[in-house]
């Protein structure tokens, strides 16, 4: 009692340490295993935490084959896999493959150089230090939602993540956003018994909304089941509702709850603090997804900054393959570093 927690150090150095056990991080670990490299994955949540955080009744836009990893088939009951099916799939793949994953272990910093990285992490027992020859960051973006940046956004009735409709039954809910997450949440809330208003700054929701959701949403608006307030920018949030700026002037929208779903941006703290060079809001990357710090790679969403619409599990898998192929060649001494 009273003594500071000590930093526990893992003695063995691994060839590859992967930060993040989402689909792309797991894919990187699978490639490490296939290529004969020792690996360790550190994840601050559970395996496939990103998928776990999706709305409970969400259906993927991609077909099952496009989000499979490691050659393991994903069997879905419908034409598209559900959140639950994908979550169980990724966790079972990690289990069957015997991937070395430490969950509920948050990475705090990455230091060092190619061949001798030190990764500091924290679990419930305190801080731990890990050694690795190469580091692959696959932290994704779902834990870093975009914010409105307006007064009142931190009030307790304002949410930046949507799970399910049950807590909002019979209440006035304003959903802010115009893409998949917002439209899907609005429909789910309506069917769960909430009184829903969707607020969006554009003239209409984005045409990229999932093709099976868009006509459903349009029909609910036409029949008056969901109210759509377009060309509206949120100025402030109060305990009673939202102040909106519209072409016709300032307007107040009463709401018991406000769900802000305006997209996400890649988590970049680890990369920036490790000294990675950025081009605008995206890290500089080689064709093998190596950053400006030799031996430190970034794959999946974390390589795209705010442009999260350009990366999916499907192309993130290719990032992981390219990065691990390059790492394996260097570990074996087959290819000199450019």
Regions found by a protein language model. Give the residues of each.
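Predominantly flavin-linked oxidoreductase catalytic cores and closely associated redox partners
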Residues: 112-115, 125-213
């Amino acid at each position: 009692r009273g003594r500071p927690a000590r930093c526990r150090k893992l003695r063995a150095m691994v060839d590859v340490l992967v930060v993040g056990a989402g689909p792309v991080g797991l894919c990187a670990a699978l490639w490490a295993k296939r290529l004969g490299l020792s690996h360790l994955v550190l994840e601050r949540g559970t395996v496939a935490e990103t998928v776990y955080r999706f709305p409970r009744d969400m259906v993927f836009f991609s077909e099952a084959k496009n989000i499979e990893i490691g050659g393991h088939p994903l069997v879905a009951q419908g034409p598209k896999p559900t959140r639950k099916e994908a979550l169980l799939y990724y966790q079972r793949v990690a289990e069957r493959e015997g991937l070395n994953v430490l969950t509920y272990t948050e990475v705090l910093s990455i230091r060092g150089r190619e061949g001798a990285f030190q990764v500091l992490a924290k679990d419930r027992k305190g801080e731990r230090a890990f050694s690795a020859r190469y580091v692959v960051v696959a932290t994704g973006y779902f834990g870093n939602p975009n914010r409105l940046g307006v007064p009142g956004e931190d009030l307790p009735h304002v949410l930046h993540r949507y799970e399910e409709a049950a807590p909002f039954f019979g209440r006035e809910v304003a959903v802010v956003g115009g893409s998949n997450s917002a439209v899907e949440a609005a429909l789910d809330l309506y069917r769960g018994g909430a009184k829903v208003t969707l607020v969006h700054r554009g003239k209409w929701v984005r045409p990229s909304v999932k093709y099976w959701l868009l006509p459903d949403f349009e029909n609910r608006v036409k029949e008056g089941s969901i109210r759509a307030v377009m060309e509206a920018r949120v100025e402030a949030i109060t305990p009673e509702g939202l102040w909106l700026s519209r072409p016709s002037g300032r307007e107040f929208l009463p709401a018991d709850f406000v769900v802000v779903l305006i997209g996400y941006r890649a988590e970049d703290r680890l990369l920036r603090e490790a000294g990675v060079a950025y081009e605008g809001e995206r890290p500089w990357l080689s064709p093998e997804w190596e950053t400006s710090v030799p031996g430190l790679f970034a794959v999946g969403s974390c390589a795209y900054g705010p442009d999260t619409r350009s990366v999916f599990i499907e192309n993130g898998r290719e990032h992981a393959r390219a990065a691990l192929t390059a790492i394996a060649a260097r570990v074996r001494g087959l290819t000199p570093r450019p």
